[in-house]
Amino acid sequence: MEQKNLDQIIRETVARYMKHSLIVAGNWKMNMTVREGMEFLEKLGPVDGKVMIFPPYTTLAVLAGEFRRRGITYGPQNFHYKDSGAYTGEISLPMIRELGCGCLLVGHSERRSYYNETDEEIHKKIQAALSEDFSVMLCIGENLDERKSGQWKKVLRKQLLEDLEGLSRDKIPYIQIAYEPIWRWTPCAPRS
């Protein structure tokens, strides 16, 4: 995909979504048991607007019906782009479909950092998810060094270009971009 075309698509997508209501998304990471997840949902109360939750696999499987009943979009924090195989610890798109998931989290900074997930792998996941009619929440972000050195725009552009390479224009509405400034969320970063 040409640089100019992708830039134009990104601008159009951002402009279109800015006209819509806000999306509130929560990644539960490796937190919340099924019981804790249910308690959280009870405290949350009725949902007004678009809410997305990405719980751990065990909680996802058990609370899928509760998420649906409350109108919450839900999905896994990770998945494999192949439908089956000897991939210990992974979950496939057919397995995810059985749970009624609507959106898949892709490219989270912890997946990129702790598991060395590359933009090439993220690209494969996005292509697989979109080909199976899932929507995707793509996480992009820069670390503190990239931020301080003024390279943050270059980093974000690279992630977008490589993660979305070759994507047809008709798939853009099925992608939400989540900007996660990694430097703000590390344990050492001051919180405000």
Segments (PLM) and residue ranges:
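Active-site loop-to-helix "anion-binding N-cap" substructures in soluble metabolic enzymes
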Residues: E2-S192
